[in-house]
């Protein structure tokens, strides 16, 4: 059966989802961490085997026959619930009680004087003396106290609590009659009070010390062996985008049994449009099917047949499984359209409207995978052209790289094309129906059916982009989430936590899921929550839209899932779509990722009445989950995983594993990552140096020390409050390991000698046992559990019993009806009145009428400090304001539309058209008038701190020239220096926008100054990396081609700068695909055409989200002067490395350009990037005023050109072959996956073997591979890595080092890295020229001669 028929017939879905369902159904708890409920006491041993768990079927048989009583004990137990039921085998009474100390069960109670707990019955009221039910309550209470008082440890129990309290509590207990017994029992199952919970994955910290002077080579070797015995080293942590995740089809199109003919019959126009729709959709579908069937599937078969197990992972990185997902849904739509085409346009609309919602999730995942697709494909093609692309057994369709790219990337164009056709089809139907009805209303329901399904399809397509907001819609910009660059990320929910307004530079989105809250907080019973798993936090959003709850069960077709919409917005950096189905949300609670322990259990869903998976989140901090209302603070949260679109793909264990992986991502110090080989329990071992672990802020509750003894466990636990269990492992001989272990509660000790091959098995057994002890012995975690149990019991007894769901549903229907009535009179807009509130101190709001005036006043205040010319500026402000107000509205609207379209096209990329100088005498007023074309909306000149300047380019030129003119007869050297700064900035911008000629030598001076300044800014912006190096070994290894110096300034050739400063194109992304905004920070600051921020200081809290450079204090000229002064006077440790020109000849350089691939110098549409061979606009022939022409950079270059030629070697030909390779390996192909989902790799061996990589290197590069590279770079902190504002210094990369087949300790590694930073020979030849250049730029030399 072909790929198309398997997808279209549904045979594939049936097989896939049935297999997934069976695997979950037969998945048992054996081999996992099992946690029993608290059993009414704190035990010193493993209580798992003491808990007699009944199956869900047994409980379902008991609930209808049981009686539930509730009571409250002030002195000890608090809220108490007791379930009394008859034993079906013996006829005696059984009880199961619930309190904050857990669950206790007593079978076949003795209810007479033979019981030693009979004194409690003597304290019953006379009316209850003969009641066996009341006797069972009293005896159960006293037995609970007896278990609790006998708990070992430092647990204090009120000794005065006796049979009198037990009898009194039984007298006051009331029968729960508000809810049916079976419904109340189901709530107990939903809360997980009667079941054993499971954990399938956990995190273990592994600590070693290779850097100490006392560490011998033998210890280093043993550490190396031990860590590999723990598990397999991971090449990649995780990436959900690289996992096949089809969406189950809840609704599908079926051919009508009794088809009704459409009213418009045999219409040529409508039939033509339907034919076009089928043709377009068929073309997209068959191209995808051809790619899968004739290339990708044979390639996967070929790779799976090989011995290497990592090959399929590498193939999926190049050809992600999302290709299969979009092919599957296209085949389903194509088959539905073929069936519907025989019944006319109404059925065509039904087919499209029914299937189109399933395009959304597949396409947003596919769009996220396309960020680096072209780069990965080009690299894969260059390495495997002969083996794969020219192999007819694999490439059966003879597909080239351009063909594959057009099919995979071009698939995203399908949706907008389909929308255009659907709009034409609908308009044509309306037009023809109007003619047929003779302009009268049509009484049939045909048009309403068309409208319904048309809106369903178009809403999905529109959700991929966004519509421009109406000018009348006012949304406060403070009510949004900001990225570190100040760009609005998205509107999520109200009551946004302040701590999540920062840190977006390193934060990644790991997963988003829609779940049902078992314990809603308020009387409105909003029980749908959105779980967002970040790399550092977990966040719960509550849907608070009554109409959403009212409509969710009344839909005959699929609506877009809220979690999918949020994922598209956060992962693909898209604003939230303006959809009617998008509900209002508010923040429920949140916590740090390592403060939560998550377990999963089985229960019965009250919605589907089927067995479903549930999750329990327990916060182990002292304060519980954080929220905006202290009264609603909770310790635990229970959720049902909805049986919806992700069925077959997402279960509780997968979500728990994502949370544990996020804990790994949250590590602040370098580490090595290993995972156990047991499929039942995944133990992620994070190996860190002792010094790094001591400074680590995110620690696991369990720690394993390698060859490091712990002499005083009590003192150790006092110093490490987050650690609850510690192990030590050391070799006795080559085959035996000595294991020693302790826990904080002093209830566990281990001192055994095991075989080295049994290390993983021993670790698993010890971890499973200690997790059970952790939850059942008296500890800080069990204290938090008692508080969680107390809330659960109170919720069942006092909140759940008071909820009237019938009245609640009636109220919701009334609200939805009122909203629908209001929507007729006015269009529906999202309520953002309470969306994220940002403190006013961080905002400077400017009203529309004063936008230009405020902007100029801000510039005037800075000028006033230097020249005291405020009076002149104020008079000019009045003229500008008047001219702005006199501008006609019509022209304003037209220009606004032009700028809006440009902004939408460029999306933040500055227009690279060469600027034209404008003299103030003639054009100032006109330009200032044009600044009023910004529209009627508010303009904000600062978002938090630092304060960015929101100016048009024309305004910026005017302000610069006005300042120069006003300074006039300034104060001597200060005036000259200010003019030089303004002209230098203008000249640098013009240079960056001009096209660079072939003659690189003529611009060497300018290039070096730009690179020097860029390096200063880069070192200022880079403080470390959070990336896990995926291909490291143990212990750390450093390649000879890399160095580490935090203060190193790197100068590269002009070609490298061209690659480095190029903005991230849409088609070939050379930036980190993870967080577009985060990874662009250093690069944007390097781009001289990018406007600098005006800032005096950073955030008030001391942690800036991004680093900004002030125009006043950090201009290009000042940065150059400062850097060159430091280097010239040898007052810093910075090193300037110049590339050696002896490695390549001029002919070779020409050959390099001629042999470059088509994508090497690819320039996206509407983007001007410097290219080789272009004729630039002459810098010295531009019309400028005499006052600014005197310090032009081109004239400076002419004066000391000969000096630069002699000292900087103008005949120097850069080693482009080597440098381009470095750029490609470290920049372009360094990151393959999305940072929001995964820890990415940075390796040339990402998709290919080391042999293939070595064979692809030039001969010269292979011969000099061991020599020191003049490019001093750090693999763990490249421009594409994430920048963490918490880092104060650059850390050593977690990469292995092999030096003469001997593993070096970290101390020796650090020495080698420092020694590798020795200055090159070329530095001595450039010292004099730099001093000369510094004096020129400081104005100490006179050019008048």
Swiss-Prot record:
Phylogenetic lineage: Eukaryota, Fungi, Dikarya, Ascomycota, Saccharomycotina
Gene: BUD3
Compositional bias (Polar residues): 910-935
The name this protein goes by in its record: Bud site selection protein 3
Keywords of this entry: Cell cycle
Alphabetized Pfam families for the sequence: Bud3_N, PH_BUD3_C
Record keyword Cell cycle present: yes
Residues annotated as transmembrane: none
GO molecular function terms noted in the UniProt entry: guanyl-nucleotide exchange factor activity
Function text: Co-assembles with BUD4 at bud sites. BUD4 and BUD3 may cooperate to recognize a spatial landmark (the neck filaments) during mitosis and they subsequently become a landmark for establishing the axial budding pattern in G1.
Compositionally skewed regions (Basic residues) per UniProt: 893-903
SMART domains in the record: RhoGEF
Region (Disordered): 843-939, 951-998
Extent of Low complexity compositional bias: 961-980
Family assignment from sequence similarity: Belongs to the BUD3 family.
Source organism: Debaryomyces hansenii (strain ATCC 36239 / CBS 767 / BCRC 21394 / JCM 1990 / NBRC 0083 / IGC 2968) (Yeast)
Biased composition (Basic and acidic residues): 854-867, 874-892
């Amino acid at each position: 059966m072909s790929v198309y028929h398997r997808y279209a017939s549904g045979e594939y879905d049936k097989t896939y989802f049935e297999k997934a369902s069976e695997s979950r159904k037969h998945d048992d708890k054996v081999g996992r961490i099992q946690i029993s409920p608290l059993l009414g006491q704190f035990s010193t041993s493993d209580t798992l085997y003491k808990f007699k768990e009944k199956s869900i079927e047994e409980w379902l048989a008991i609930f209808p026959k049981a009686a539930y009583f509730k009571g409250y004990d002030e002195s000890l137990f608090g809220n108490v619930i007791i379930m009394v039921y008859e034993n079906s085998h013996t006829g005696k009474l059984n009880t199961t009680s619930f309190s904050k100390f857990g669950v206790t069960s007593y079978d076949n109670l003795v209810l007479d004087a033979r019981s030693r707990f009979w004194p409690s019955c003597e304290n019953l009221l006379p009316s209850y003396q003969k009641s066996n039910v009341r006797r069972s309550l009293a005896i159960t209470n006293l037995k609970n106290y007896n278990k609790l008082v006998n708990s070992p440890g430092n647990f204090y129990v009120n000794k005065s609590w006796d049979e009198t309290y037990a009898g009194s509590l039984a007298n006051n207990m009331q029968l729960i009659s508000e809810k049916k017994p079976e419904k109340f029992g189901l709530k107990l199952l939903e809360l997980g009070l009667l079941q054993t919970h499971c954990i399938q994955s956990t995190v273990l910290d592994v600590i070693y010390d290779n850097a100490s002077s006392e560490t011998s080579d033998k210890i280093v070797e043993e550490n190396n062996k031990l860590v590999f015995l723990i598990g397999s080293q991971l090449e990649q942590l995780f990436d959900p985008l690289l996992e096949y995740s089809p969406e189950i089809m809840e609704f599908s199109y079926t051919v009508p049994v009794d088809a009704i003919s459409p009213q418009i019959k045999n219409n040529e126009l409508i039939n033509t449009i339907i034919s076009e729709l089928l043709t377009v959709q068929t073309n997209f579908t068959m191209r995808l099917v051809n790619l899968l069937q004739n290339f990708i599937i044979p390639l996967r078969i070929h790779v799976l047949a090989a011995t290497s197990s990592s090959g399929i992972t590498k193939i999926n990185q190049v050809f992600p499984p999302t290709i299969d997902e979009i092919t599957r849904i296209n085949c389903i739509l194509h088959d539905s359209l073929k069936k519907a085409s025989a019944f006319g346009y109404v059925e065509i609309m039904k087919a499209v409207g029914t299937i189109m919602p399933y395009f959304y999730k597949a396409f947003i995942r596919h769009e996220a995978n396309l960020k680096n697709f072209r780069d990965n494909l080009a690299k894969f093609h260059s390495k495997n052209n002969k083996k794969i692309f020219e192999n007819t057994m694999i490439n059966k369709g003879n597909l080239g790289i351009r063909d594959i790219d057009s099919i995979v990337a071009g698939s995203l164009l399908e949706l907008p094309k389909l929308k255009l056709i659907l709009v034409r089809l609908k308009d044509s139907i309306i037009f023809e129906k109007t003619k047929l009805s003779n302009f009268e209303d049509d009484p049939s329901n045909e048009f309403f059916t068309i409208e319904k399904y048309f809106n369903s399809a178009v809403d999905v397509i529109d959700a991929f982009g966004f519509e421009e907001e109406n000018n009348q819609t006012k949304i406060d910009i403070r009510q949004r989430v900001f990225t570190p660059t100040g760009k609005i990320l998205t509107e999520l929910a109200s009551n946004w936590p302040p701590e999540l307004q920062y840190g977006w530079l390193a934060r990644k989105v790991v997963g988003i899921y829609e779940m049902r809250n078992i314990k809603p907080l308020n009387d409105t019973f909003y029980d749908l929550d959105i779980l967002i798993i970040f790399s550092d936090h977990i966040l719960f959003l509550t849907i608070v839209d009554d109409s959403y709850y009212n409509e969710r069960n009344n839909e005959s077709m699929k609506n877009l899932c809220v979690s999918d919409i949020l994922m598209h917005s956060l992962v693909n950096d898209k604003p939230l779509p303006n959809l009617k189905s998008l509900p209002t949300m508010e923040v429920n609670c949140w916590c740090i990722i390592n403060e939560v322990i998550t377990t999963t259990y089985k229960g019965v869903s009250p919605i589907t009445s089927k067995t479903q998976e549930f999750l329990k989140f327990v916060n182990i901090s002292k304060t519980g989950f954080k929220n905006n209302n202290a009264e609603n603070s909770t310790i635990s949260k229970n959720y049902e995983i909805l049986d919806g679109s992700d069925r077959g793909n997402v279960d509780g264990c997968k979500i728990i594993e994502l949370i544990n992986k996020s804990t790994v991502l949250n590590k602040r110090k370098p580490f090595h990552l290993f995972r156990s080989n047991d499929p039942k329990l995944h133990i992620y071992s994070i190996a860190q140096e002792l010094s790094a672990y001591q400074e680590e802020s995110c620690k696991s509750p369990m720690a394993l020390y390698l060859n490091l003894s712990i002499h005083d466990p009590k003192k150790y636990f006092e110093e490490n409050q987050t650690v609850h269990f510690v192990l030590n492992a050391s070799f006795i001989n080559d085959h035996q390991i000595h294991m020693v272990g302790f826990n904080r509660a002093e209830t566990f000790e281990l001192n055994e000698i095991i075989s080295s091959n049994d290390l993983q098995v021993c670790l698993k057994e010890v971890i499973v046992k200690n997790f059970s002890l952790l939850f059942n012995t008296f500890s800080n975690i069990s204290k938090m559990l008692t508080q969680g149990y107390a809330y659960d019991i109170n919720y069942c007894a006092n909140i759940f019993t008071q909820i009237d769901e019938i009245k609640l549903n009636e109220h919701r229907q009334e609200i939805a009806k009122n909203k629908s009535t209001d929507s007729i009179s006015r269009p529906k807009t999202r309520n953002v009145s309470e969306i994220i509130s940002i403190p006013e101190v961080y905002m400077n709001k400017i009203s529309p009428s004063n936008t230009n005036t405020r902007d100029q006043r801000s510039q005037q205040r800075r000028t006033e400090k230097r020249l005291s010319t405020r009076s002149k500026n104020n008079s000019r402000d009045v003229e500008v304001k008047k001219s702005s107000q006199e501008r006609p509205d019509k022209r304003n609207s037209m220009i606004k539309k032009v700028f809006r379209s440009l902004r939408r096209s460029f999306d933040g990329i500055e227009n690279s058209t060469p600027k034209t100088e404008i003299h103030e005498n003639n054009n100032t007023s006109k330009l200032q008038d044009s600044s009023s074309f910004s529209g009627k909306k508010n303009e904000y000149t600062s978002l938090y701190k630092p304060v960015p300047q929101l100016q048009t380019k024309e305004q910026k030129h005017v302000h610069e020239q006005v300042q120069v003119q006003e300074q006039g007869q300034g104060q001597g050297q200060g005036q000259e220096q200010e003019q030089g700064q303004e002209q230098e900035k203008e000249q640098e911008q013009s240079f960056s926008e001009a096209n660079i000629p072939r003659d690189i030598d003529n611009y060497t001076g300018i290039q070096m100054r730009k690179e020097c300044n860029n390096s200063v800014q880069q070192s200022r912006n880079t403080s470390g990396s959070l990336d896990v190096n995926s291909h490291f070994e143990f212990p750390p290894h450093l390649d000879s081609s890399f160095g580490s110096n935090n203060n190193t300034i790197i100068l590269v050739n002009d070609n490298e700068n061209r690659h480095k400063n190029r903005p991230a194109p849409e088609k070939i992304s050379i930036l980190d695909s993870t967080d577009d905004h985060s990874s662009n920070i250093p690069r944007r600051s390097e781009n001289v055409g990018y406007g600098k921020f005006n800032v005096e200081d950073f955030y008030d809290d001391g942690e800036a989200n991004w680093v900004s450079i002030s125009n006043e204090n950090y201009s290009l000229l000042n940065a150059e002067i400062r850097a060159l002064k430091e280097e010239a006077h040898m007052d810093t440790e910075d090193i300037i490395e110049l590339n050696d020109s002896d490695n390549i000849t001029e002919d070779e350089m020409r050959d390099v350009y001629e042999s470059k691939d088509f994508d090497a110098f690819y320039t996206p549409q509407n983007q001007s990037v410097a290219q080789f061979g272009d004729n630039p606009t002459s810098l010295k022939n531009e019309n400028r005023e005499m006052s600014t022409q005197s310090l032009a950079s081109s004239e400076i270059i002419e004066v000391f050109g000969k000096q630069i030629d002699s000292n900087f070697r103008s005949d120097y030909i850069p080693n482009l072959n080597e440098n381009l390779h470095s750029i490609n390996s470290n920049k372009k192909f360094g990151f393959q996956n999305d940072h929001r989902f995964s820890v990415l790799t940075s390796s040339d061996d990402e998709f290919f073997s080391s042999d293939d990589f070595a064979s692809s290197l030039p001969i010269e590069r292979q011969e000099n591979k061991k020599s020191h590279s003049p490019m001093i770079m750090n693999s763990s902190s490249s421009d594409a890595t994430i920048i963490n504002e918490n880092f104060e210094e650059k850390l050593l990369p977690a990469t292995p080092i092999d030096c003469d087949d001997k593993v070096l300790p970290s101390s020796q590694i650090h020495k080698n890295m420092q020694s590798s930073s020795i200055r090159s020979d070329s530095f001595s030849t450039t010292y004099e020229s730099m001093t000369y250049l510094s004096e020129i730029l400081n104005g100490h030399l006179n050019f008048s001669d």
